[in-house]
Amino acid sequence: MTEVKFMPPAAKFLKKLKDKKLKTLYQEAIDKIREDHTIGEAKNGDLAGLYGYDIYYNKTNYELAYKVEYVDNKVIIVVMADTRENFYDELKRYMKG
């Protein structure tokens, strides 16, 4: 099975999630991405090489940003997870830093 690693911003957000339903939706999204990494929307420009996956819950749009790396096997790296508000600005800042 494809390995999944979490960068600090994603790990922190997912660890702080208290809502069990939302946490389950994120886990289901990660499982879907693990099966087919092209399921997310490929980003371009400053975010080329990343994919974005939308999660809708309780009238709020949540995002999951990830990239795929090949070492010995395919590894999916979850870069960031959060609400849609300012998500891509934060993601760009993190990727540049």
Predicted regions and their residues:
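Conserved catalytic core of Hanks-type protein kinase domains
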Residues: K16, K32-I33, A81
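A short, surface-exposed loop/turn module that caps and links secondary-structure elements
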Residues: D31-N58
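Short amphipathic C-terminal alpha-helix that caps PH/PH-like domains
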Residues: I30-D31, M95
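Enriched for short, Lys/Arg-rich terminal
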Residues: Y57-E63, K67-G97
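Arg/Lys-rich, positively charged N-terminal/basic patches that mediate binding to nucleic acids
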Residues: M1-A29
